[in-house]
């Protein structure tokens, strides 16, 4: 749909948003589905990419027994009425194609920290069923979490391992907020290659 219209998901999410400034959230105010309590925004602050989508699930959309792990307190936690968990970030190139998936500590995302097993349980609850700011973009973001679920599960587990390792090596710093540990796991992706793997797996099951 977007290719036929000579556009892409990045252009769509930035459409009508004015100048593109580093660290600002696009669209302004983020995208939030009040029924599923899914949330995302697009911004930029890393070299080697145009920008990236950060995806979240807010507390009301989580399994009822999910609780944050023991962690340092931060001012941003006191300014919200609920909690939220970062799920995965999707890095985009200048042509508007996804090139990486990555996880972070709290320095950029200002979320509450949930254990990997709980974050993995949240993945299937993420769904953006909205027309604003772009229905195709909302479908695309939701579909990316479905298509790359195995890789996201792996990255979330590596995230916990990376933070635990950082805390051992740097006991005097807050690993949840340390800029030296801001990217906790990362991997390159290809939509075309992933679809081929899915097709091959389905063919194997069918035979």
Task: Write out the residue ranges for each language-model feature.
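Generic preference for hydrophobic/aromatic residues in regular secondary structure cores
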Residues: 38-42, 98-102, 145, 190-193, ...
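Alpha-helix initiation/capping motif
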Residues: 56-59, 93, 115-116, 129-133
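Aromatic- and glycine-enriched beta-alpha-beta binding-site module
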Residues: 25-99
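Long, compositionally biased interface segments
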Residues: 133-207
């Amino acid at each position: 749909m977007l290719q036929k219209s000579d556009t892409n998901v990045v252009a769509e999410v930035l459409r009508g948003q004015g100048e593109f400034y580093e660290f600002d959230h696009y669209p302004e105010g983020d995208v939030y589905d009040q029924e599923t309590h899914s949330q995302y925004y697009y911004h930029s602050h890393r070299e080697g990419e145009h920008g990236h989508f950060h995806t979240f699930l807010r507390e009301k959309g989580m399994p009822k027994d999910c609780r944050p792990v023991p962690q340092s307190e931060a001012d941003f936690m006191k300014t919200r009425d609920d909690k939220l968990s970062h799920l995965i970030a999707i890095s985009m190139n200048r042509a508007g194609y996804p090139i990486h998936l990555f996880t972070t500590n709290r320095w950029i995302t200002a979320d509450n920290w949930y254990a990997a097993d709980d974050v993995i349980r949240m993945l299937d609850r993420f769904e953006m069923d909205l027309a604003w700011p772009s229905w195709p973009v909302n479908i695309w973001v939701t579909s990316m979490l479905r298509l790359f679920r195995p890789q996201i599960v792996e990255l979330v587990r590596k995230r916990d391992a990376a933070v635990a390792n950082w805390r051992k090596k740097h006991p005097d710093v807050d690993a949840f907020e340390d800029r030296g540990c801001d990217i906790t796991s990362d991997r390159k992706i290809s939509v075309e290659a992933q679809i081929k793997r899915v097709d091959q797996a389905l063919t194997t099951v069918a035979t």
